[in-house]
Amino acid sequence: MIALKGVKMAVIHATQDNFEKIAGTNEIVVVDFWATWCGPCRAFGPIFEQVSEKFDDVPFVKVDIDQSPDLASAAEIKAVPTVMVIKRGDVIYRQAGALLPADLEDLVNQAKAYDPSKDDEGNSVSESSESENDGE
């Protein structure tokens, strides 16, 4: 389930069986943990789908916490909806609550630009930690 450039992807409904493969084979994955009984989740669903159409290179994944309770537990989901962004297999963002379309779009753009190997000043993390150890 690797995203292909130029190919519009529908929102993927993930389960315990396919979630790890999706998260492990894509650079960035945006996840919406939700439940059918959750009013805010149902209101956020169309926003999630709408924004997903703007990013053909990023999979947007929905996980129903009642259908995949072990996955929700492993992800430490305490409230729904919860939006999570995974980059290179690491969770780089998690927030309970729905987002506005512009905020979700900004979040995806920030995730695409985020480089976990750089610090806030743009220096390589390995370089900055090496220079700190030089004085010892």
State where each predicted segment sits.
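Short, Lys/Arg-enriched N-terminal segments with co-localized hydrophobic residues
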Residues: 1-8
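The canonical Cys-X-X-Cys-His
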Residues: 38-41, 83
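Non-catalytic, surface beta->alpha helical segment in thiol-disulfide oxidoreductase systems
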Residues: 87-117
